[in-house]
Amino acid sequence: MKRFKVGVVGYGWAAGAHIAAINAGSRAQVTKVCSSRPLDAAELSARHGCPIQTYSDLAAMLAEPDLDAVSICSYHRHHKDQLIAAARAGKHVIVEKPLGRNLGELREAEQAVRAAGVKICVCFEARHSTQFRAVKSVIDRGLLGRLHYGEVDYYHGIGPWYGGFPWYRTARDGVSSLLLAGCHAMDILLLCLGGDVEEVSSYSTQSANAAFAGYEYPSTTVTLLKFKDGKVGKVASVLDCLQPYYFHTHLVGSEGSLLDDKFHSNLIDGLNRNQWSTLSYRPIDSSDVADHPYQEQFERFFEAVERGEEMRLSGLAEAVRTHEVIFAADRAWKENRPVKLAEILTA
């Protein structure tokens, strides 16, 4: 038996991908699932190829002494309370974003994790993709020089044809275009540009197509970020486009630029200004959770737990920072004004 025994909370689309990724790794195995829907333990065990106990009561599952960690894949409105319950029970936590739907929920979740001393992995999994490991390598090697501008944009038409649409579109669970989905683009921009955000401005709009009329919040937002060190960034979160899924990346530095899978650098001999070099990686080009780099992320998480360390890249501190910028951006378009990050940090 693998070392860490994991219980999954919620049994939907994301949960299936979490179970497969955890079980495919070398350090953990899913042994329990808690769901509001009745589940047959024998059928679930056969489907996932390992013994799984089922629960309808989260407290009962968390009380089990042979449970080391939980993976929260429930509706967004439940994340904060379930995360706090798991932390207080002494369980390490994997949680789908968001940590909370607003600043108050974020602070409650953050404080509970810190007070309990458990380790946490937040599913900003794009940081662990081969694409952004390659991009970060180009940045860290200095091939772009000093970055001064970046844009990372999320284009994914989420309409009635999409499985999660009935609850994604609600203000209760979806909350905003940026928090629901564009958060991955914001998280990657912050990873690539580094430094502290000083101020954000954000604008909202939405499609006239009737397919997207069900959204209870603007389905497109564009956010401009001003960093304390002078860098500028932009994130578009577009849920009402009619096109293939597209995760756009453009970074500009003093010695070169990177555009999706291409980059140019003045520091590479033999290149002229009209030539791109090409990066080799598996791109983020699908919304299917089965294609997300969960296995890499979860392996890194359980490695960190073994060492008694905080997870790198997608631990608590990084996730809180991304949420803070998102909440500033959402406040900016709602109040039609620039928002200083200091307003969020001192709230």
Walk through the language-model features, giving the residues of each.
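Beta-loop-alpha module in the N-terminal Rossmann-like domain of NAD(P)-dependent dehydrogenases
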Residues: 52-112
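Active-site loop of classical SDR/Rossmann-like NAD(P)-dependent oxidoreductases
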Residues: 36, 242, 286-299, 314
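Hydrophobic residues in well-ordered beta-strands that form the structural core
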Residues: 95-96, 120-122, 235, 260
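Predominantly a Rossmann-like dinucleotide-binding segment in NAD(P)-dependent oxidoreductases
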Residues: 126-214, 336
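N-terminal Rossmann-like dinucleotide-binding module
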Residues: 1-49
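Rossmann-fold dehydrogenase core element
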Residues: 108-125, 145-150
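C-terminal helix-rich "cap/oligomerization" subdomain common to oxidoreductases
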Residues: 28, 69-72, 228, 300-347
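Contiguous beta-strand/loop segments that form the cofactor/metal-binding neighborhood of enzyme cores
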Residues: 186-266, 295-310, 346-347
